[in-house]
């Protein structure tokens, strides 16, 4: 008997994808949105199947992503934002809670929720990951969502 291998592909032709974006550090968030939309387009997706939801900050991303996922309108959700370390422990709390909350929302809803939230030590690292030296993590998160949509469809 041959082992069956199931994988998701990268076609986004009929994929309905919601982007949930933190407005805090918006100049980074907007670059991540541009990267995500570019990825969806390059993989055959269309703008009419993309919706963008904006929330105040990274702490709110999990609850908005969960609510969006529960609408049943989308095949996947992509969370985008930037949490940049400051001089207080606030970074650690927000980064941990956003990460945990997004994972929990995906598990509870059964809808793939991709993590495209930057957690960086400084603004330079965030800029690098939003479309310069280190690529665009919004693009990467959208690609993860597309692959997960196709994997779910193959199950």
Swiss-Prot record:
Family annotation (SUPFAM superfamilies): Lumazine synthase
Coiled-coil segments on the chain, per record: none
InterPro entries found in the cross-reference section: LS, LS/RS, LS/RS_sf
Entry's EC annotation: 2.5.1.78
Gene Ontology terms for molecular function: 6,7-dimethyl-8-ribityllumazine synthase activity
Entry keywords, A to Z: Riboflavin biosynthesis, Transferase
Binding site residues for 5-amino-6-(D-ribitylamino)uracil: 24, 58-60, 82-84, 115
GO CC, alphabetical: cytosol; riboflavin synthase complex
Pathway in which this enzyme or protein is active: Cofactor biosynthesis; riboflavin biosynthesis; riboflavin from 2-hydroxy-3-oxobutyl phosphate and 5-amino-6-(D-ribitylamino)uracil: step 1/2
Residues involved in (2S)-2-hydroxy-3-oxobutyl phosphate binding: 87-88, 129
Active-site residues, Swiss-Prot/TrEMBL: 90 (proton donor)
Catalysed reactions listed for this entry: (2S)-2-hydroxy-3-oxobutyl phosphate + 5-amino-6-(D-ribitylamino)uracil = 6,7-dimethyl-8-(1-D-ribityl)lumazine + phosphate + 2 H2O + H(+)
GO BP terms in the entry: riboflavin biosynthetic process
Family: Belongs to the DMRL synthase family.
Annotated function: Catalyzes the formation of 6,7-dimethyl-8-ribityllumazine by condensation of 5-amino-6-(D-ribitylamino)uracil with 3,4-dihydroxy-2-butanone 4-phosphate. This is the penultimate step in the biosynthesis of riboflavin.
Protein's recorded name: 6,7-dimethyl-8-ribityllumazine synthase
Originating organism: Chlorobium phaeovibrioides (strain DSM 265 / 1930)
